[in-house]
A protein has these predicted regions:
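Pyridoxal 5′-phosphate
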Residues: 1-179
Length: 179
């Protein structure tokens, strides 16, 4: 990220990073990496509820809201608030989701990102070593290189990915996304 950030800064390009798989487990330094906007979802590596996420925006970067209205801050105004972050928060905030995300962040701080990353690496190595022994399994990518996010891409010959995802979830408690 640092190398890409340097190139973006040199050429005055906006550097937007999707940290959905890594936020909370891998260190991300917006300043030293020259990241202008850091986006993340709460339900993946941050272990929060679905429907949560966020965006860290470097001071001076202007973003237009996708939706406006119903801010709840100034309900009688006919103009949507212009002050950040309220300018990007149309509608009622997901207070329950935000509370759940806060609890997840407390858990990550308590356990530490390094311990979580180590456990994810152990599970990834174990899964890869076992899945390789199944005939017809095709793994995509280098699974010997760590640190890495615990994301795997694979196909199983003659099987629909949706069926495989269902079996892994129901029979083994392994969460996947088919497709």
């Amino acid at each position: 990220l640092e190398a890409i950030g340097r190139v973006c800064k040199k050429h005055h390009l906006l550097f937007v990073v999707d940290a959905s798989q890594t936020a909370g487990v891998f260190p991300i330094q917006m300043d030293s990496m020259n990241i202008d906007v850091l986006c993340f979802t709460g339900h993946k590596s941050l272990m929060g509820p679905q429907g949560t996420g966020g965006m860290c925006v470097r001071k001076g970067v202007r973003i237009r809201p996708l939706l406006v209205g119903g801010s709840g801050i100034d309900s009688y105004s006919k103009i949507h608030p212009q002050v950040m972050p309220t300018a990007l928060e149309a509608g009622t905030l997901n207070a329950h989701g935000i509370a759940g995300l806060s609890a997840a962040l407390d858990f990550i701080k308590k356990v530490t990102p390094a311990v979580i990353r180590q456990r994810e690496e152990e599970l990834t190595r174990r899964f890869v070593s076992q899945i390789k022994s199944i005939p017809g399994v095709k793994l995509y990518g280098n699974y010997e290189q760590f640190p890495r996010a615990p994301i795997l891409s694979l196909n199983i010959l003659d099987y629909d990915s949706g069926e495989i995802a269902d079996v892994l979830a129901q029979d083994y408690g392994i969460m996947t996304r088919a497709g």
